């Protein structure tokens, strides 16, 4: 149950990134538009007073502001799109549902335009400060103020309606409304019910949120910033940080702007204060990112490079330079964080604590810098330096230098003191035991602590999954020495990455435990999977095309630590939008897992690719999959390989994200194209 809930939270967190991804563009428009009539800048560049320039700046500012003003609607549409696999019908249903939900709440609670507007000086002016802040005008509808929470709720419900009813059949006389056309209809009914329910349930929630907001922001804000920084970074590996920071950025706190509008949420308040030209009071939950993203993590990258073995410095240097520069410029830190998260968790613990102190220090110094994307140099210029007199952004530089020094020396000390296997410090060569292929299942069973220590045994095409009684009896180093490319430990659950032979090992281990296999000569592990390295260097150059219609995401965003950590190899994540997986190149089918959820292919030039459809889909036991090919069959690029029931997978698997891994990259170079929207004819990767 927890695992399923965790998977759903990951999907929601990922879905929230879609509306959040719009904010950088809106923020840039707002920041530049506002900056173009900034008094200090106008004094330096008087030409900014030109009427045409003033009009352009006003349009830019208004274009950016309207996005922030309608965030709840964007969250409704974005959440629905994310949870429904990107189908536009779900987005339309969310839009309709959001409007109906707000209209329903307004009518049930008898909210009128007079509850929103006050009349003064003969004109209608928005005066939320003098009215009930629990009410709002949403796209012309007087209603209850539910903020982005209302948008997320309606978006999630619209996605549920889509996944539940998108292929519904109706009697012939209602046939026009069958299938996807039925989704907005049923969503409308759900929206009415939701509006009625929220009319009575949301006011107490509002009171609770306001009380929590007052406690966190007014009574104990200093401690809150520290705790916020720790929790936000701690959730990065699980992909749940988007869920955590959303209330702080978009709901907690309130400010009435010069137009009389009530603005909620730390990020939105900062943007409103930027436009109003008043001193900043918001930014406590954004500013803390700048010191560790721009200075701390790049310094940590240098410490990792410095401690790499001499023969590995060139490779590690390139990796760390790229990751460190990305963190500095854009605030995208996952490539760097994931480079040491799995191999040296103690470093990530240090990083989490330092991130918390960064938020605390920035708050104590009164630095207030907003952001839309992340705490990199680009946002620092737009929202910090251009407003340096109000934001006190210059203090980030000395504080950042201190953090760079602290990060460097703490990482350097920990790496040497605890002999951490950071990039470039891995064992030069894992000793391979003198174990015949046939004896491998016996040796793996012994390394897991023996028959009595096995509580549950399972496998998929990438890994051996074992739940043990006593984890202390497991010889992790021994498992790696037997050929596992990595071992993941979650509680008493061990995942050993043996690649395609994992299922054969599991099969033989089960037979050994039951007494059906008593000697190595009776095992079924094949010769080709044993003493020879699992990976074979590819020959030639291979173009790899998209395996279907969908979205391409970085491998680091795949919600599975084994794939995201590149334990199986490098590649990309693919989010299918249609239920057909096709061949990414001309080649041969090498493996089809018994549960049909994974396919191994080999190109004509020798590149081996694993397509793993969904996450934890091995547990579906083949339900939702229809194989269209056989092992050893020749295939051509674009040829259908598998039919997939996406609706079934969305309902029964943690995620439909499909890792596409190059399993024998070795010393070859993988070039990943800058592609997001993909179809079978689009190039996504090249192995050189």
Curated annotation (Swiss-Prot):
Membrane-crossing residue ranges in chain numbering: 12-32, 81-101, 137-157, 182-202, 223-243, 284-304, 315-335, 340-360, 364-384, 395-415
Q: Does the keyword Ribonucleoprotein apply?
A: no
The cysteines covalently paired via disulfide bonds are none
Xref: PROSITE patterns: PTS_EIIA_TYPE_1, PTS_EIIA_TYPE_1_HIS, PTS_EIIB_TYPE_1, PTS_EIIB_TYPE_1_CYS, PTS_EIIC_TYPE_1
Q: Is-annotated flag, keyword Kinase? A: yes
- The catalytic activity of this protein is classed by the Enzyme Commission as 2.7.1.-
Give GO BP annotations, semicolon-separated: D-glucose transmembrane transport; phosphoenolpyruvate-dependent sugar phosphotransferase system
* Alphabetical keyword list: Cell membrane, Kinase, Membrane, Phosphotransferase system, Sugar transport, Transferase, Transmembrane, Transmembrane helix, Transport
The record's Pfam families line, in alphabetical order, gives:
PTS_EIIA_1, PTS_EIIB, PTS_EIIC
**GO CC annotations, alphabetized:** plasma membrane
Q: Where is the active site?
A: 460 (phosphocysteine intermediate), 612 (tele-phosphohistidine intermediate)
- Mind telling me which PANTHER family this protein's record contains? CYTOCHROME C-TYPE SYNTHESIS PROTEIN AND PTS TRANSMEMBRANE COMPONENT (PTHR30009), PTS SYSTEM GLUCOSE-SPECIFIC EIICB COMPONENT-RELATED (PTHR30009:SF20)
Function summary: The phosphoenolpyruvate-dependent sugar phosphotransferase system (sugar PTS), a major carbohydrate active -transport system, catalyzes the phosphorylation of incoming sugar substrates concomitantly with their translocation across the cell membrane. This system is involved in alpha- and beta-glucoside transport.
Name of the protein this chain belongs to: PTS system glucoside-specific EIICBA component
Taxonomic path: Bacteria, Bacillati, Bacillota, Bacilli, Bacillales
């Amino acid at each position: 149950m927890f695992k399923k809930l965790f998977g759903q939270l990951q999907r929601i967190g990922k879905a929230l990134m879609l509306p959040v991804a719009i904010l950088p563009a809106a923020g840039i428009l707002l920041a530049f538009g506002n900056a173009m009539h900034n008094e200090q800048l106008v004094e330096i560049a008087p030409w900014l007073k030109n009427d045409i320039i003033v009009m352009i700046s006003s349009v830019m500012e208004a274009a950016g502001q309207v996005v922030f003003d309608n965030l709840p609607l964007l969250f409704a549409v974005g959440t629905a799109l994310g949870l429904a696999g990107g189908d536009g019908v779900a987005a339309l249903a969310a839009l309709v549902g959001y409007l109906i939900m707000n209209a329903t709440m307004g009518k049930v609670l008898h909210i009128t335009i007079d509850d929103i507007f006050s009349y003064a000086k003969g004109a209608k002016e928005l005066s939320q400060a003098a009215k009930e802040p629990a009410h709002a005008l949403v796209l012309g509808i007087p209603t209850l103020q539910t903020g982005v929470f209302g948008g997320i709720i309606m978006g999630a419900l619209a996605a549920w309606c889509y996944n539940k009813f998108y292929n519904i059949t109706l009697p012939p006389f209602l046939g026009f409304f069958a299938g996807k056309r039925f989704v907005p209809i049923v969503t409308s009914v759900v929206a009415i019910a939701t509006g009625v329910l929220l009319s009575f349930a949301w006011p107490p929630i509002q009171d609770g949120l306001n009380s929590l907001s007052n406690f966190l922001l007014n009574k104990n804000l200093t401690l809150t910033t520290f705790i916020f920084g720790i929790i936000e970074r701690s959730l990065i590996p699980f992909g749940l940080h988007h869920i955590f920071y959303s209330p702080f950025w978009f709901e907690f706190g309130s400010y009435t702007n010069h137009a009389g509008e009530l603005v909620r949420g730390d990020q939105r308040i900062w943007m409103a204060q930027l436009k109003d030209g008043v001193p900043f009071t918001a930014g406590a939950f954004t500013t803390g990112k700048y010191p560790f993203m721009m200075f701390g993590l790049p310094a940590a990258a240098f410490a990792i490079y410095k401690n790499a073995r001499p023969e590995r410095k060139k490779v590690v240097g390139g990796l760390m330079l790229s990751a460190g520069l990305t963190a500095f410029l854009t605030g995208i830190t996952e490539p760097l964080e994931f480079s040491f998260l799995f191999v040296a968790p103690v470093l990530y613990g240090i990083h989490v604590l330092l991130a918390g102190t960064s938020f605390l220090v920035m708050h104590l110094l009164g630095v207030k810098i907003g952001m839309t994307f992340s705490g990199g140099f680009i946002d620092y210029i737009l929202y910090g330096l251009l407003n340096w007199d109000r934001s006190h952004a210059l203090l980030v530089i000395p504080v950042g230098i201190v953090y760079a020094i602290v990060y460097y020396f703490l990482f350097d000390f920990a790496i040497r003191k605890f002999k951490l296997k950071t990039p470039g410090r891995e064992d030069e060569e894992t000793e391979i035991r003198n174990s015949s292929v046939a004896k491998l299942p016996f040796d793996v069973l012994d390394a897991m602590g023996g028959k009595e220590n096995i509580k549950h045994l399972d496998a998929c095409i990438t890994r051996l999954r074992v739940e043990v009684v006593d984890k202390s009896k497991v010889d992790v180093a021994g498992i790696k020495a037997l050929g596992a490319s990595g071992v993941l430990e979650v509680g008493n659950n061990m995942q050993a990455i043996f690649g395609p032979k994992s299922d054969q090992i599991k099969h033989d281990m089960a037979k050994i435990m039951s007494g059906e296999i008593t000697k190595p000569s009776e095992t079924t592990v094949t010769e080709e999977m044993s003493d020879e390295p699992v990976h074979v260097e590819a020959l030639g150059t291979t173009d790899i095309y998209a395996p279907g219609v969908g979205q391409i995401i970085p491998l680091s965003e795949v919600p599975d630590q084994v794939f995201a950590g590149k334990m199986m190899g490098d590649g990309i994540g693919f989010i299918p939008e249609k239920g057909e997986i096709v061949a990414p190149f001309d080649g041969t089918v090498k493996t089809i897992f018994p549960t049909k959820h994974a396919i191994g292919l080999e190109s004509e030039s020798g590149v081996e690719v694993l397509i793993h459809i969904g996450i934890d889909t091995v547990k579906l036991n083949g339900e939702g999959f229809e194989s269209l090919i056989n092992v050893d069959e020749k295939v051509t690029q674009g040829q259908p390989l598998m039919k997939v029931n996406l609706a079934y997978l969305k309902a029964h698997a943690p995620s439909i994200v499909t890792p596409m891994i190059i399993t024998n990259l070795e010393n070859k170079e993988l070039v990943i194209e800058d592609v997001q929207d993909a179809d079978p004819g689009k190039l996504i990767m090249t192995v050189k």
